[in-house]
Structure formats: structure tokens, C-alpha cells
């Protein structure tokens, strides 16, 4: 591990896309995940992400269990072997639906706790579902911070372009709907066999509505996006095949 202090964070665009998709999956609760990458010369380079299942849905806070941290560490070890470079958990992210991008006192305390284990650990906050006062349009803000003597300190952040979406980010994107469905199933299980018939009907209706919501905002758009990418890749393949044939004719001619 590099002992230098954190000076800058580089976030790959495919990781940014996954985090943002997760943040936009619900405007009623905060969501969270863990960031994986490598750290060297004061720069944290984030190239993978793990979406965490919410153990308890709360509007104003999120929590990471020790089991989830262990799972993330195991995934980092797996990526170390797969990519043949050192990978580890570099930080966490969570959403602020309808509220400021600034870290709350709880966020700062949580961040300080993580930094006691790793001084270079960083936090990202995605402020979503906010409306501009003048434009009245949907705005998204991103804050990168650490805790310093009980106060939030902003860390320079650069979003680094990646020409393609990595396989690991694609897997994470497709896992999102599964995780959200599992959260709803866990909540439904807790309310199962309610003695009040009307309450039971209401709970089932809420569950059905939640599952439809997941399909509409996550699964269906993701399928449509992948279908468009497949069509585009086919066009590119056809174009490259034609170029290859022309070059072969020139060489043979």
C-alpha cells in the first residue's frame, strides 16, 4: 500500500455510469455501494464498483455491514488475479435524493470511521432528483470528500473517459435489478401472513407496484440500451468487413 496521502481521485466513466444508474433507481431512499481500484502516488484510480443491498431502508442514511465489506474485499482479490494488478476497496458512494450534495454530519462521521482503517479511503455523494431554482430542470451533482478533524474536505475528482464498458461494470449493471428485487422480496417476507386481510392485500399491492417500478426504470431501459449497442456493433462490424475487403483487393491488385 502506498503511504502517501490522497491527493486526487480518478473515476472511470463506466463506473460513474453504474453509480449514477444506482442513485437514480429510487428517489425515496438513499442507496450505496463500494468502490474498487488501485492507489499509487496519491491518486486513487477507481475502475470497479460493488452495489450493496440495503439491509434497512432509511431516507436519511445508509449503513455498510462487516459482511458486505468482506465481500467487497474478496471481489477486489478476485479482480487482482483477473486484471493482474493490485486492486482493493478504495471508498464508498451513496445517494442524496432531493437533498444537497454536501456531506451530512453522519456522512462525515462514517467517513472518519473508514479512514481509521485506511487513510486514503474516499467518499462520493451523488445528489439526484434535485430541481434547479431558475431552470426548474433536473440537476445531478457529485461530491468527492474525506473527513478531516470532524469536517468534510473536498478531494479533486476527475472522470476519466473509457471507450468501452468493462465486463465487470456490465455485470454490475445487470445485477442491479436483481438486488432491487431481492430487497423487495425481503420486505415482503417480513410482512408475510399478516392477520389483517386488508393489510395483506395492501402489502401485496405495494410489492407488485415496486417490482413493476424496477422493471420500468431499470430492466426495460437496460435491455433497450443493450439492443441498441448490439445493432451499432453489427453496423461497425459490417463497415470494418468492407474496409478489410477493399484493402485485400488493393493488396491483390
Curated annotation (Swiss-Prot):
Subunit structure: Component of the BRISC complex, at least composed of ABRAXAS2, BRCC3/BRCC36, BABAM2 and BABAM1/NBA1. Within the complex, interacts directly with ABRAXAS2. The heterodimer with ABRAXAS2 assembles into a heterotetramer. The BRISC complex binds polyubiquitin.
Residues annotated for Zn(2+) binding in this entry: 94, 96, 107
Effect of residue 183 to A: Abolishes metalloprotease activity
Name under which the protein is recorded: Lys-63-specific deubiquitinase BRCC36
Cofactor field: Zn(2+)
Keyword Signal: no
GO molecular function per UniProt: cysteine-type deubiquitinase activity; metal ion binding; metal-dependent deubiquitinase activity
Free-text comment on the cofactor: Binds 1 zinc ion per subunit.
Keywords noted in UniProt: Cell cycle, Cell division, Coiled coil, Cytoplasm, Cytoskeleton, Hydrolase, Metal-binding, Metalloprotease, Mitosis, Nucleus, Protease, Ubl conjugation pathway, Zinc
EC number per UniProt: 3.4.19.-
Amino acid at each position: 500500500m502506498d503511504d502517501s496521502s490522497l491527493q486526487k481521485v480518478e473515476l472511470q466513466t463506466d463506473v460513474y455510469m453504474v453509480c449514477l444508474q444506482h442513485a437514480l433507481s429510487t428517489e425515496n431512499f438513499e442507496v450505496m455501494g463500494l468502490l474498487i481500484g488501485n492507489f499509487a502516488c496519491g491518486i486513487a484510480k477507481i475502475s470497479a464498483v460493488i452495489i450493496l443491498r440495503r439491509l434497512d431502508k432509511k431516507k436519511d442514511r445508509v449503513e455498510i455491514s462487516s459482511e458486505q465489506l468482506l465481500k467487497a474485499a474478496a471481489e477486489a482479490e478476485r479482480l487482482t488475479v483477473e486484471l493482474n494488478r493490485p486492486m482493493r476497496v478504495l471508498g464508498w458512494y451513496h445517494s442524496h435524493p432531493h437533498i444537497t450534495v454536501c456531506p451530512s454530519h453522519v456522512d462525515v462521521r462514517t467517513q472518519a470511521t473508514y479512514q481509521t482503517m485506511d487513510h486514503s479511503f474516499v467518499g462520493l455523494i451523488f445528489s439526484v432528483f434535485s430541481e434547479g431554482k431558475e431552470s426548474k430542470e433536473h440537476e445531478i451533482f457529485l461530491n468527492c470528500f474525506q473527513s478531516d478533524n470532524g469536517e468534510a474536505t473536498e478531494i479533486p475528482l476527475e472522470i476519466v473517459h473509457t471507450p468501452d464498458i468493462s465486463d465487470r461494470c456490465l455485470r454490475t449493471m445487470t445485477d442491479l435489478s436483481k438486488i432491487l428485487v431481492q430487497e423487495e422480496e425481503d420486505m415482503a417476507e417480513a410482512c408475510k401472513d399478516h392477520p389483517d386481510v386488508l393489510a395483506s392485500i395492501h402489502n401485496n399491492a405495494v410489492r407488485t407496484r415496486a417490482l413493476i417500478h424496477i422493471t420500468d426504470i431499470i430492466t426495460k431501459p437496460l435491455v433497450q440500451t443493450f439492443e441498441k449497442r448490439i445493432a451499432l456493433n453489427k453496423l461497425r462490424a459490417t463497415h470494418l468487413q468492407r474496409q478489410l475487403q477493399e484493402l485485400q483487393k488493393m493488396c491483390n491488385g
